[in-house]
From Swiss-Prot:
Organism taxonomic ancestry: Eukaryota, Haptista, Haptophyta, Prymnesiophyceae, Isochrysidales
Listed name of the protein: Small ribosomal subunit protein bS18c
GO biological process, alphabetically ordered: translation
Assembly mode: Part of the 30S ribosomal subunit.
GO cellular component labels: chloroplast; mitochondrial small ribosomal subunit
Amino acid sequence: MYKNPIKANLGEEVNNSLNYKDVSILSNFVNEQGKILPRRLTGLKSKQQKKVTKLIKQARIAALLPFVIGKN
């Protein structure tokens, strides 16, 4: 039903120097439809998830990440 959690060591990277321009890292937290993955799948803590969500939304507004992927 759900794909396996990412559970990578990206939590430390989120705390330090993650930026809305780091699209390659932020794309790990977005599914194939362009939706932001929930905490139960990413394995991030609450503050980290809020920061990632905020950065993804900033990247979408800056046109670095798409709002919707593959809508036909």
